[in-house]
């Protein structure tokens, strides 16, 4: 991406998903130490399992490394067994939270309306939501990818985010763990469509909202992807589990 005086710093977000026991904290410490030695051009965040969030936040406190939750509930409290509220994420030391990740939408049937509720709750708790959108292979092959994703953006972002910090992550489901790769042209086309919708919804603020790419970003492809127009960072999955790989992506900027 090309930075200007009004463009926020890029964001490289490492989503550990359902991976990581206590020993994984050593990987986070290694990332933090490397970023202290050489401050990054981007903001960097790790999203560990909820069981590690508090300990990881303490382990990297004061470093150039943010932490966040992989999900939050739309309610602040109540009879929601197994769920975590946005306030709990913040209380554990997180400053960001992922809302509507493709695996949450697929595995748990989360709708865009529910995602919007999560994003609203996150912002109200002082967290920065990363709202995820993306299409399946079937939708893309039907020629409906752009219209589908734009609709997701529209329905997943509550108007209450106006004036609040948030970002959008584009996850092409067909390029995650399938062996398929989204071309830079695919990425640029979709990010441009998302940008247009953001400007339509949020006016000038929509011009500076970061749009992250989240389709199997790895050290080998990070530089090309991060240099593409309208790509404001990356939502990284498996490659964020090892400090060496994650740092290579961070340093690609």
Swiss-Prot record:
Chief site of localization: cytoplasm
Gene3D superfamilies: Aldolase class I
EC category name: isomerase
Gene Ontology terms: cellular component: cytosol
BP GO terms, sorted: gluconeogenesis; glyceraldehyde-3-phosphate biosynthetic process; glycerol catabolic process; glycolytic process
Catalytic activities: D-glyceraldehyde 3-phosphate = dihydroxyacetone phosphate
Any coiled-coil regions, as ranges: none
Stored CDD domains: TIM
Lineage: superkingdom: Bacteria
Keyword Nucleotide-binding appears in the UniProt entry: no
Keywords linked to the UniProt accession: Cytoplasm, Gluconeogenesis, Glycolysis, Isomerase
Cell compartments where the protein resides: Cytoplasm
Documented EC number(s): 5.3.1.1
Pathway the protein contributes to: Carbohydrate biosynthesis; gluconeogenesis; Carbohydrate degradation; glycolysis; D-glyceraldehyde 3-phosphate from glycerone phosphate: step 1/1
Active site feature: 101, 171
Record: residues binding substrate: 15-17, 177, 216, 237-238
A GO molecular-function annotation: triose-phosphate isomerase activity
Pfam families: TIM
Family per record: Belongs to the triosephosphate isomerase family.
PANTHER family associated with the record: TRIOSEPHOSPHATE ISOMERASE (PTHR21139:SF42)
Assembly mode: Homodimer.
Role description: Involved in the gluconeogenesis. Catalyzes stereospecifically the conversion of dihydroxyacetone phosphate (DHAP) to D-glyceraldehyde-3-phosphate (G3P).
Descriptive protein name: Triosephosphate isomerase
